[in-house]
């Protein structure tokens, strides 16, 4: 990771003007030190991908100074890497320190009166703006280690420097900067240091404030999958050690190998994720690399859970270790600075006054890789982190390493020595061993023959080729016993082979069952590769289902695997009407290897009698769901209501009367997304159809409509069929009556008559209306209106194609074209441009329908 160092100097101008302020002297020493580091301390983590090697570590410097009423800030981060100059005539570039001294000693045309008129608050606000501009020029997260060194002469008032402290807080929270305050007045800076999580020190040697060996800073994260909880331990760092060896796959002496892979950009994760505890005897030697790092906390005086976590890791012995994973993104091109963590987003976020400051996530382009570290105690309060090769890195490298070692160790020898070596490598027998082997072979063949005869007696109708089978059995038994004896020559002496008993006849096929599969290196490689693919699938699924996780919470890791069907394969199981073809069989879903362990001797009856504390410790099916204080049930109910509202208001089409069935009684208030589109408010006829089947819901609905939303909704839905026709806004007792009216044939031709319910207008005094009788305002519903419009469009389209009412095919063409056009219009969600869509659908299908009906008429 690249190192970015920001020095901040705040000091009042003294009466006796100093040539160089003390804070700038410290900054100058640090600048000189960083120049040395940019040449010597450029090492970083090894490559974790075949895409390329990480580039050398660069060092950057910036300065912000507030001296009296004069102020200076670097416009950009200065690269301290030694530049290669080709032309001697070029003038050296002025450094940030030189620019700062010039700006403070020779201010730009400001007199004393203008300086005195500037308040301290304005100066700190200007400094905060300049610091925000520097933070916006930092690279994407995971590539930079930021150190902020503050050199104040005395503690200013908090209300004056609050804006500048907020800019430093932005660097701390969203750019994981390490803050160090160097001041003689430690008590005055304790409050600000606690707010910034900074380390307040009194140091006359600023060179000790920057640790050049730090390669990564972040948190240690431990996740618990069962209850989807996680714990973070901040302020950890990985440091390089001086005795670090170069891994075997890196050859610094060969310059040709360095140019094989190009330099790429590595973006490291913000946390070390805990994987598992492991015994060192279980890790194959070729997975362990020679790269060793050091794990420690960044602040020596830090107390709390991070110090306790470090003590626990230091207690790991030489036989046990903890494996942690550091995610990394590898990209051939640099990612731009993250706009999600810019100063503008920071101001917007802090204006909402959050209780806890959360870091916004950033999506980085590139290949997803990971580093694996084996953490063990090192002593003196530190841990060593040994780099482990992942499955993708070790694939083929172990066998290649073994081959190279044997080739390097293979020295040419003369013919006599090679012949003696070959003879020595052959197995050596003596008379006792051969006799003992023949005795074991005889016992094995006797047992095999007995077992063979026993099976033949159980099968009376045996085949004719019994002698051939018996000969093959004896040959296989001899081959197996001799091979077994030769394999035991190196490990077991033949004197101990007398204790070996052969109980059943063995065959060569069973040899694979005797050896331990856990010893195969290929098995470990395949298992690691399979786990790596599972992790990639989980990450991909979590990115695609982000909105669902916000509604339903995080899913269990075992339930994330889904069995997907192709669209064509899925449609085979359903009819065109949407019904199942037959009884569908449940799909076999692969579960994890971890079986659910039920508490022994636990029944539902015993579980009901247990108190809450003991029941929470038990393991039973559905127990976590029942003991969550109804949070899961409330979440399911809330999501079902949301889903029903979306289905009810968003999925309803324009030419259908039937509503989708909903599981809950809905609020009469439509969702805000619906009000943004005219014509998407539900019509009165659909609400009528919904309420007709349930009288209780009708009473509740009418009460809600009259009480909660009296007239505003009906005024907005001008294109829909209202349940209540408002006659006036005057006061009076309303007596709604229900009437049944027959739908006239002129409204919809060819449609069957159906009864509708309307509510009459309320009675009003005689002064407001001359007549006191009830007026029925029967209106046409939206679906009826759309059907009538479509029939008119279809009729006009047929007339354009010379198919009039008197034509014999008119009725059939009219009905068929109406149904086809209605099918094309059913997916429309609004009424905008509906008439044009009707004309388009009818004209596109008119010729085909007319030709079909004419051919049908000719055949008849």
Curated annotation (Swiss-Prot):
Segments of skewed composition (Basic and acidic residues): 772-788
One Pfam family, short name: MTBP_N
Region of interest (Disordered), residue spans: 671-788
GO BP term (any one): protein localization to kinetochore
Keywords assigned: Cell cycle, Growth arrest, Ubl conjugation pathway
Biased composition (Low complexity): 717-731
Bias (Polar residues) ranges: 732-758
InterPro entries the record matches: MTBP, MTBP_C, MTBP_central, MTBP_N
GO cellular component: a single term: kinetochore
The family this protein is said to belong to: Belongs to the MTBP family.
Function: May play a role in mdm2-dependent p53/TP53 homeostasis in unstressed cells. Inhibits autoubiquitination of mdm2, thereby enhancing mdm2 stability. This promotes mdm2-mediated ubiquitination of p53/TP53 and its subsequent degradation.
Protein name: Mdm2-binding protein
Annotated organism of origin: Xenopus laevis (African clawed frog)
Gene that produces this protein: mtbp
């Amino acid at each position: 990771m690249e190192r970015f160092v920001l020095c901040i100097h705040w000091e009042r101008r003294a009466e006796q003007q100093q040539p160089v302020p003390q804070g700038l002297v410290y900054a100058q020493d640090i600048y000189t030190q960083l120049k040395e580091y940019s040449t010597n301390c450029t090492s970083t983590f090894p490559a974790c991908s075949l895409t390329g090697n990480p580039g050398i570590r660069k060092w950057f410097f910036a300065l912000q100074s507030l001296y009296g009423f004069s102020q200076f800030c670097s416009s950009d981060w200065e690269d301290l890497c030694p530049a290669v100059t080709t032309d001697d005539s070029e003038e050296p570039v002025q450094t940030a320190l030189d620019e700062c001294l010039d700006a403070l000693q020779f201010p730009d045309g400001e007199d004393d009166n203008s300086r005195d008129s500037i308040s301290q608050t304005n100066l700190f606000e200007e400094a905060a703006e300049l610091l925000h501009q520097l933070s916006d020029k930092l690279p994407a997260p995971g590539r930079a280690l930021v150190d902020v060194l503050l050199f104040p002469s005395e503690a200013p008032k908090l209300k004056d420097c609050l804006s500048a402290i907020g800019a430093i807080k932005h660097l701390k929270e969203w750019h994981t900067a390490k803050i160090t305050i160097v001041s003689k007045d430690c008590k005055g800076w304790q409050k600000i240091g606690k707010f910034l999580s900074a380390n307040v020190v009194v140091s006359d040697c600023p060179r000790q404030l920057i640790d050049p060996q730090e390669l990564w800073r972040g948190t240690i994260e431990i996740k618990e999958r069962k209850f989807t909880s996680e714990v973070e331990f901040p302020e950890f760092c990985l440091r390089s050690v001086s005795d670090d060896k170069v891994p075997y796959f890196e050859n610094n002496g060969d310059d040709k190998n360095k140019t094989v892979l190009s330099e790429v950009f590595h973006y490291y994760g913000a946390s070390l994720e805990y994987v598992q505890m492991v015994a060192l005897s279980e890790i194959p030697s070729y997975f362990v690399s020679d790269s060793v790092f050091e794990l420690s906390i960044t602040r020596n005086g830090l107390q709390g859970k991070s110090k306790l976590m470090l003590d626990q890791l230091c207690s790991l012995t030489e036989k046990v270790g903890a494996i942690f994973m550091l995610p990394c993104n590898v990209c051939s091109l640099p990612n731009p600075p993250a706009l999600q963590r810019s100063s503008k987003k920071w101001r917007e976020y802090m204006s909402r006054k959050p209780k806890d400051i959360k870091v916004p996530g950033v999506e980085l382009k590139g290949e997803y890789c990971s580093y694996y570290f084996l953490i063990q105690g090192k002593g003196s309060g530190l841990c060593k982190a040994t780099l482990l090769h992942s499955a993708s890195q070790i694939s083929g490298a172990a066998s290649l390493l073994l081959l190279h070692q044997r080739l390097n160790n293979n020295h040419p020898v003369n013919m006599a020595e090679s012949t003696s070596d070959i003879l020595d490598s052959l197995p050596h027998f003596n008379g006792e061993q051969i006799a003992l082997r023949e005795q074991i072979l005889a016992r094995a063949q006797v047992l095999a023959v007995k077992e063979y005869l026993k099976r033949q007696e159980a099968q009376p109708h045996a085949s004719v080729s019994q002698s051939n089978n018996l000969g093959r059995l004896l040959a296989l038994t001899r081959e197996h016993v001799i091979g077994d004896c030769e394999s035991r020559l190196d490990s077991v002496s033949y004197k101990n082979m007398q204790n070996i008993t052969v109980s059943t006849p063995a065959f060569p096929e069973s040899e694979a069952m005797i050896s331990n599969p856990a010893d195969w290196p290929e098995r470990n490689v395949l298992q690691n590769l399979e786990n790596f693919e599972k992790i990639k699938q989980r990450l991909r699924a979590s990115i695609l289902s982000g909105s669902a996780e916000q509604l339903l919470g995080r899913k269990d890791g075992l339930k994330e695997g889904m069995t997907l069907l192709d669209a064509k394969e899925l449609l085979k199981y359903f009819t065109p009407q949407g019904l199942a073809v037959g009884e569908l069989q449940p799909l076999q879903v692969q579960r994890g290897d971890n079986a659910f362990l039920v508490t022994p001797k636990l029944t539902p009856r015993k579980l009901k009698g247990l108190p809450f504390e003991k029941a929470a410790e038990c393991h039973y099916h559905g127990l976590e769901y029942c003991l969550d204080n109804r949070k899961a049930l409330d979440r399911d109910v809330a999501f079902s209501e949301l889903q029903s509202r979306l289905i009810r208001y968003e999925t309803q089409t324009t030419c259908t009367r039937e509503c989708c069935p909903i599981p809950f009684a809905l609020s009469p208030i439509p969702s805000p997304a619906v009000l943004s589109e005219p014509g998407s408010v539900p019509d009165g006829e659909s609400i009528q159809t919904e309420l007709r089947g349930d009288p209780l819901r009708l009473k509740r609905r009418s009460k809600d409509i009259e009480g909660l939303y009296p007239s505003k909704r009906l005024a907005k839905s001008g294109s829909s069929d209202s349940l209540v026709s408002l006659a006036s806004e005057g006061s009076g007792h309303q007596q709604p009556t229900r009437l049944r009216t027959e739908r006239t044939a002129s409204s919809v031709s060819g449609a069957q008559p159906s009864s509708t319910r309307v509510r009459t207008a309320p009675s009003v005094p005689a002064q407001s209306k001359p007549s006191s009788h009830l007026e029925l305002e029967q209106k046409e519903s939206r679906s009826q209106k759309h059907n009538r419009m479509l029939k008119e469009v279809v009729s006009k389209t047929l007339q354009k194609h010379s198919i009039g009412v008197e034509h014999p095919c008119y009725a059939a063409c009219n009905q068929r074209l109406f149904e086809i056009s209605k099918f094309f219009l059913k997916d429309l969600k609004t009424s905008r441009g509906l008439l044009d869509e009707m004309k388009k659908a009818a004209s596109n299908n008119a010729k085909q329908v007319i030709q079909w009906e004419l051919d049908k008429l000719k055949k008849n």
